[in-house]
Amino acid sequence: MADWSAAQYLKFEDERTRPARDLVAQVPVDFPRRVVDIGCGPGNSTELLVQRWPDAQVSGFDTSPDMIEKARVRLPNVSFDLADASTWQPAEPVNVIFANAVFQWLPTHPAVFQRLMGFLAPGGALAVQMPDNLLEPSHQMMRDTAAEMPFADKLKGAARGPLPPVSFYYDLMSPLADRLDIWHTAYNHPLADAEAIVEWVKSTGLKPFLDPLDADERKMFLDSYTAKIAKAYPKTADGKVLLRFPRIFIVAKRAG
């Protein structure tokens, strides 16, 4: 895929940061020495880590040069690097490994979770949040639109696979954790209109569908997709639309 756009991502910064804030609040580590933000993006989640643990050595990494550039401007005293979660390895044990809305993009993330647990210091925690919204109209319409387009062959394989059920993550992580907490939260975001929903997903879920297309194809796709979204998300009494956004949270603490 083309590089991620920090500016597009930050159009809905408050809404995107709220799940990270909810995840940070549930990490059962009071005085960590080293905290790492995997897939730190433009630094909005990293900022929460610095606020909760001001005395910790907080760092972050991402695969996107644009995201890292913005994160360094936002938090000049934090170390940010380009790295891939699937191959990253810390130089020494870490007390908190934090990953907000990253691992849904990595099909091999269950194996990566197991690796990351091995990088924790005793009493450390792995904290993960992933969108679990592939059955929502916002994402169903992406797949429907892709299948209808005359250039559908270009979009084969664009859709990411669904996440495993909660029981899978429990069975995967419980042998590795002294304490394991898994839960779902469905956020209901009031947005201006259907176009706002499209703007939201442009920087994330819609990106794999748009990147392979030329300008004319992209316009054709977006016109069709936006029309479907307008039908799927009717206006509320105040004229806005509600974007329902389910997410799964996993916090696994290693024995101390």
Swiss-Prot record:
Signal peptide: none
GO biological process entries: methylation
Subcellular location: Cytoplasm
E.C. number(s) listed in UniProt: 2.1.1.144
InterPro entries registered for this protein in UniProt: SAM-dependent_MTases_sf, Trans-aconitate_MeTrfase, Trans_acon_MeTrfase_C
Keywords linked to the UniProt accession: Cytoplasm, Methyltransferase, S-adenosyl-L-methionine, Transferase
UniProt family annotation: Belongs to the methyltransferase superfamily. Tam family.
SUPFAM superfamilies, sorted: S-adenosyl-L-methionine-dependent methyltransferases
Identification of the protein by name: Trans-aconitate 2-methyltransferase
Enzyme class: transferase
Chain segments annotated as transmembrane: none
GO molecular function: trans-aconitate 2-methyltransferase activity
Record-level GO cellular component terms: cytoplasm
Function field: Catalyzes the S-adenosylmethionine monomethyl esterification of trans-aconitate.
Catalytic activity: trans-aconitate + S-adenosyl-L-methionine = (E)-3-(methoxycarbonyl)pent-2-enedioate + S-adenosyl-L-homocysteine
